[in-house]
């Protein structure tokens, strides 16, 4: 990925993605899916049509999925309802429908496009992850969801992310 030598921000995103892969991967485990994700993500970084922030949120969510810690975005985590609208609760681990929301204090109201994006990222094959863009609103909502989710469920402070935050 020689193109990243001339793109400091892209290079630091790459460092961040490698750091996440290092955090999740374990010796003697079958880590092909995570390595495939890392490879496709690095390829996406050199594609100027996809914003780096979107690449970041896609990578974070898919890495969490591969590790088996994905939020439930297809149905209510409390009652299992798939039809009712809901809010995203980090503390509950995903979608909470309008019927079950009364005990939830961290619910985020998400645009239907954001719900669809989360569902697509979780269900798509790694090879098809980086073939779309989103509106600014969806990008902001993805930032909120992934920021909160990473803070609660990923027990690690990534040094490269700290540098990225200073750069952007």
Region spans (language model):
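Non-catalytic alpha-helical scaffolds and adjoining flexible linkers that form interface surfaces
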Residues: 1-168
